[in-house]
């Protein structure tokens, strides 16, 4: 049995400017797009005028997919060995390993993104937000254990980790962005 204790911690932050105030001040922005390839995410840093300053790709998607595929093969092999007559929590260790693997990669990529944001003196991180139906179809098409599936976990981790560094994370609807 796994019990997790979450204790809320109060932490003061000196930079409490809103996104609008930061944009008017000409702060740098990191825009991130998640992928389903070897790169978990691609990011570009823009200055206040919209000029590109730096570009970065965070890799490891193939490695993550490979580890997940190996664990799923072990689960399938275990189920075939018992002829589908499994009772209880037979493959729990494999499922927990998959869960911990996704948490590990989520934290790892989040830390890399945040390190890059701090190096580039970024004030706002922008993540894409899609409508629910589109997200559901894309996630279903990418598979449960593909790199794209980690985008929600990475977004959640980025939210609280960036706040500690005085960076605001926002989600912007991605409709029509490709037309610009």
Annotated model-derived regions:
Residues 3-180:
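Positively charged, helix-rich recognition surfaces that bind polyanionic ligands
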